[in-house]
A protein has these predicted regions:
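Cofactor-/ligand-binding subdomain signature composed of acidic, glycine-rich
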Residues: 1-39, 160-194
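Glycine-rich phosphate-binding loops that contact phosphosugars or nucleotide phosphates
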Residues: 37-186
Length: 194
């Protein structure tokens, strides 16, 4: 129950520092607009609850980016000979940043030339260190087995990535972008009300 009640603050920590003047700003992202425009394949790779974040996030990313997004279980990704090269963006999602299957999938994708963008909670984790780029969720420790704030913050950050990239690609209407950014800013308070 404690961690459920911490969700509004966790979402605020994940969202607020990245919203400025009605824009999504990722100060810590090294990806350039040119590199983003060059991706022709996008994978979301994760395990457990993070995989389910990817399944939900896929729909929003496809809507915003007008590109196919494939979601893969990390434990299966490296065994299926995925079509991955230097024009592939692989988004790794992990709460701990230490999940072994996810680490193995990251290494396989990187070996094939993919650009790795990770969404993780634990600063300085193995996945964060081995990624080309990392966005932290800043959800804080999560002790309960049933995920709450980690799931919420991962999904919020993934949605922000989609919105930011869509603006760069020109695949989102200005009105939809502005409305969604406004809704993101209100999300922590809306969660608190429920």
């Amino acid at each position: 129950l404690k961690e459920i009640m911490e969700q509004p603050d966790a979402l605020r920590h994940a969202i607020a520092p990245r919203l400025r003047g009605g824009e999504i700003v990722f100060d810590d992202l090294k990806l350039t607009p040119e590199k983003i425009r060059g991706f022709d394949r996008i994978f979301i790779v994760a395990c457990g609850s993070s995989y389910h974040v990817g399944m939900v996030g896929k729909y929003n990313l496809e809507h915003l980016l007008r590109r196919n997004v494939e979601v893969a279980l990390a434990s299966e990704f490296r065994y299926r000979d995925p079509i991955v090269d230097d024009k592939t963006l692989v988004i790794i999602i992990s709460q701990s940043g230490e999940t072994l299957d996810t680490m193995a999938a990251l290494r396989e994708a990187k070996k094939r030339g993919a650009y790795i963008l990770s969404i993780v909670n634990v600063v300085g984790s193995s996945i964060a260190r081995e990624s080309d780029d990392v966005l932290y969720t800043w959800a804080g420790p999560e002790i309960a087995v049933a995920t709450t704030k980690a799931y919420s913050t991962q999904l919020a950050v993934l949605d922000m990535v989609g919105l930011c990239f869509a603006k760069i690609l020109g695949t989102v209407r200005e009105e939809e972008y502005a409305d969604t950014v406004r809704e993101l800013a209100l999300l922590p308070d809306k969660v608190k009300e429920t």
